[in-house]
């Protein structure tokens, strides 16, 4: 049996115990056990809910560099068939947060033993997949004291080969919002539709109307998506449904488009209420701020990546992906980038299988970048 690196082994350990947002208790304990086993001379450790802050004191600090990783899993039943598959039935690390954590621990291990001039702050953030941990973590008393001067994070990219790094200046990820619409009418016997207000029909009409928003209300040079991923309503085949619920997501590349889309949704729901004589409620659930990369820091990072041996850099396009790291970037200059992991299955897929060779390569690259940035 071939040996694997310690950080690949860590990734496999973490892959077995995916936990949902703000329920990452086993994950937090695993991380803390590892962190407490490192040399402690330069470390300061604080917990926040199920997250962790670790400050690495520099030798002659002039600034603080932040590095953030997310730690939660998804409510997806794993289908990889791997020997280290999820032991938590119905949950999976299907977005690569196990890879993200193992890379962060690799960096922390190095800098605990080989400090640089500047202070470092490692942020192990819960609930990225929902309901959102970045914003409350940013607003915490801990981060008011330990607020980095710059911050960075990565996300795995299944579509890129191992050895690839991709990013761009400015807008990288979209503004996102959940969407839940509840309709309440009047149920009744299927034989007497005139005596009821059918919420299945109302819901179907609303879904069709929503599709016109992107086509006719959003600037064609901008981009927006409204996806209804789930419709529920009714009880049995011969009873007219009193309730119906739509669940979906909104994604836009601009803040103005998000505002416009929500205005149009609200107008259409008001129309449905009148047309079908029903009640309706809209809940936008979790909302994530766009990921906007600081142009100066990102350009500098791109130049570093382009000159780093063994790395292929790609200047990518913006994506409709959502990431609550955008809240941190709205307050702290920094950037996010894609790290290629070459998987035939994409993010949030039950068969996502990142190439683990990306872990040690990502650690080596980021050690070099952070060392260079923190000593200059």
UniProtKB/Swiss-Prot annotation:
Keywords: Amino-acid biosynthesis, Diaminopimelate biosynthesis, Hydrolase, Lysine biosynthesis. Its EC number is 3.5.1.47. Pathway: Amino-acid biosynthesis; L-lysine biosynthesis via DAP pathway; LL-2,6-diaminopimelate from (S)-tetrahydrodipicolinate (acetylase route): step 3/3. It catalyses: N-acetyl-(2S,6S)-2,6-diaminopimelate + H2O = (2S,6S)-2,6-diaminopimelate + acetate. GO terms for molecular function: N-acetyldiaminopimelate deacetylase activity. The keyword Amino-acid biosynthesis applies. GO terms for biological process: diaminopimelate biosynthetic process; lysine biosynthetic process via diaminopimelate. Catalyzes the conversion of N-acetyl-diaminopimelate to diaminopimelate and acetate. This is N-acetyldiaminopimelate deacetylase. It comes from Geobacillus sp. (strain WCH70).
